[in-house]
């Protein structure tokens, strides 16, 4: 598709050069403007620019209900960094004799790498201190205090909840039939 678009643009520029040379700068300006529109959107979404959807698809906001946006779970890295910063700001330390426990709904490896050795990562939300969830359909929205929220363009990519002292049966949502 890209080759076809490039060929069509080159053909159009050649045609303009031969028949309406004075229109070439305007054509280049329109073409450049067309390239800058999605670039601006991707800059706003950074580092999640791979989730960009054009205006025909409804942008990221419109696509959020129809598609998995952060299927790689990269927002969990930023959420992990936010959790570590929040714990430092609050001057909280792990309970005596154990590491912080984080239940993760989504790919666990990004959170595990970002959090490091001071945290235990797993699925079990019963004994966890925190819950880290992707903003995807399969992760349940919890009624617990939100410690960290990763948002772009009004779309939640990830959240970290403080679930200490709460009974959370599962982080997985039951999809509608």
Which stretches of residues belong to each language-model region?
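C-terminal luminal/periplasmic domains and tails of membrane-associated envelope-modifying transferases
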Residues: 60-177
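Juxtamembrane membrane-water interface segments immediately following transmembrane helices
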Residues: 41-67, 72
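Transmembrane alpha-helices of multi-pass, membrane-embedded glycan-processing enzymes
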Residues: 1-4
